[in-house]
Amino acid sequence: MAFATLVGVGGLSPALFSPSRPLSCSSSTSVSAPFILRAGGGGDARRHGLRRLVTPLRGSACRGESTNSRVLQCANEANVVTEDDIVNDGIDDETASDAEMDEDAEANGDESSGTDEDASVSWIEQQPLPYPSDALEPYISKETVEQHWGVHQNIHVERLNGMIGGSEWEGMSLGQMMLSSFNEGREAPHPPFFHAAQIWNHDFYWRSMQPGGGGKPPERLLKFINRDFGSYDGMIRQFMDAASTQFGSGWVWLCYKTSKLPHVKSRSPIPSDNYGRLVISKSPNAINPLVWGHSPLLAIDLWEHAYYLDYEDRRSDYVSTFLEKLVSWETVESRLKKAVQRAVERDEYVSTKHIRKQLLARAKSQIRAMPQQVNGDAREQTSGQEKSLGV
């Protein structure tokens, strides 16, 4: 599914989002995809950029016009450029495995995205490896994989299954169980969270690698990396620094950081400055970025059992080998594409709901301020008009 990104002039390098064709200001133009709204610059410039785009759309809604038919015209008037298919060109959705699709659905706690079977899970099964246990040699040995996946991860599966029968978590999918049992670090982690998160983290980790992986990321993913880290080498340095400074057991992640549009007392919601960025984060023990509302794209396991048989205490060698020889950048790019689409759809819904609420409130206040006596009592007329608006 194609999607468009609207970027305020000056916000990003023109080379990153240069338009491939001139904008059409025809009112008949129809755009079926959702949009990311981001004005360039900061402070007043960012706010005014959004208002230039959203205000005409609000006017169209008042006149009963289609919002989608006005988007390109409003973008042109607001001095905003467009670019289609930033991430999804060259990626075949049909090649994504069912496990990856389920993984992304659970990453959002999206109950509706799973199958009926997923929605009524009463027993967690260990997922198979996406490749033979010796496929990552010589960088990760068969012995390490068999111990790591076959013993350590299996322990989490067995212990979690011993806890969920007859509990409040019975019937939940793995992702739902993990998110519902997270206690925000206020006390020791709930055992169900620890085991559910470790199972999820490990499945995500195994699918972050592939035989013959590593190298440079695909072009479109590289554009995001260059934008948010300055360069591929800059991203690698930050990832290595996070791994070297993670005290004890834990994980390092490359994430797509999203945040909901804040509710502000202004005419339009303003995205946060960190909206839609790639970030490196680290987490202790079993914590993962899902509990922060971020979309993980890449993970490396920093528990000692993940690397000690092959690298002993040379954690930095393990991390650099992971990045240079094992990472499946195609998988990372596919995850990024789906994370962007989810964020677009979510924030389009939040923004539309916010605007509609304000429009209804304004219409309601106008009706009450100027009741019209047509037939019957003015108060009855006002009440009838409010009901017609659904307020």
Curated annotation (Swiss-Prot):
The keyword rRNA-binding does not apply. Binds 1 Fe cation per subunit. Its cofactor is Fe cation. Keywords: Chloroplast, Iron, Metal-binding, Oxidoreductase, Plastid, Transit peptide. Residues 1-73 form a transit peptide. One of its GO terms (molecular function) is superoxide dismutase activity. Its EC number is 1.15.1.1. Its main location: plastid. The keyword Plastid applies. It holds the Pfam family Sod_Fe_C. One of its GO terms (cellular component) is chloroplast nucleoid. It comes from the Eukaryota. It is found in: Plastid, Chloroplast. Residues 87-119 have a biased composition (Acidic residues). Residues 87-120, 370-391 are annotated as: Disordered. It catalyses: 2 superoxide + 2 H(+) = H2O2 + O2. Residues 381-391 have a biased composition (Polar residues). Fe cation binds at H148, H202, D301, H305. Belongs to the iron/manganese superoxide dismutase family. Destroys superoxide anion radicals which are normally produced within the cells and which are toxic to biological systems. Homodimer. This is Superoxide dismutase [Fe] 1, chloroplastic.
